[in-house]
C-alpha cells in the first residue's frame, strides 16, 4: 500500500490498522501536516447518503513527483493498481500518478485503474476527462461503473435495470454491454480487460448487483445479487476490485471464476460496516 501521510500518532494508528489486515506498508512516506478526511451521512429508505470531503491541503493532496521512490517499490512487484481519486485532488497529484505509471510501464508491471470518479473532488480547474484520459492509456485492466466510463471516456451507459434475481432485463442487455466493452477497448487500445460494476439502487438499503467483463472479444457476466437489507455500501467497489485482482492472479485461466469471486466479495462488503 502506497500513500503519503503526516508524521503523527494518528497516521501511525492508521498504518497499524493496515498492518493488522496484512497489508505491506513499506511504501508509505511521511510529509505534509494533515490527514485527509471525509464525513458520511448514511442514507435510509428513499433518502440518499451524502458525503463531505475535507482533503484540501492534506498530505496526499500535496503529493508531488519525486516524493515516492517508485523504482524501489516496484522492484519486487508485478501489479500496480491506482485510483482516479489520486488524480482528482490536485494537478501535482495527477503528475505524481503519471510518474508512477511511466515507471510501472517501463518496469513491465501489469497496470490496473479504478476510474473512481468523485465529482466533489475535482476542484482544481481541470475536468476528470482532461486529466484521466491520458492516464488511463497505461491501463491493462480498467474497473468502473457505467457513469464513470461516461464521465471520463464519454461512453453512453447501457443501464442496469434488474430489480431482483429473476429479472431477465440483464440478459437482454448483454449485447449492449458487449458493445460498451468494445468501445472502451477502442478508446484505450492497451486495455485487455474491461470490468463494469453494475448496481441498481431500489432504495438506499436495497440494492441489486451484477458485473460484466469484456476481454478477448467476448463478454462474461455474473449472476445477480439481490441485497434487500444493506448494511454499508461504502467500499463495495474497492472490495470488487480487490477480489478481482486476487481472482485474476489466483485463477489466471478462469476469468469467470475470478469475476464471480469479485462480485461475491463486493456483495459481502455491503453487509459489513466500514470503508475497508
Question: What is the role of each PLM region?
Answer:
Residues 107, 121-218:
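Conserved phosphate/ATP/ADP-binding segment of small-molecule kinases
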Residues 204, 220-276:
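Conserved post-catalytic alpha-helical subdomain immediately downstream of the catalytic base
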Residues 32, 57, 117-119, 148, ...:
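Glycine-rich beta-alpha junction loops
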Residues 54-57, 82-92, 117-122, 167-171:
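Flexible, glycine/proline-enriched loop segments at strand-loop-helix junctions
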Residues 79-85, 110-119, 146, 195-197:
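Short beta-strands and strand-loop turn motifs
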Residues 67, 94-99, 125-133:
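Charged helix-capping and loop-helix junction motifs
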Residues 2-85, 113:
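Conserved N-terminal subdomain of the carbohydrate kinase-like
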Residues 19, 98, 102-106, 136:
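Anion (oxyanion) recognition and catalysis
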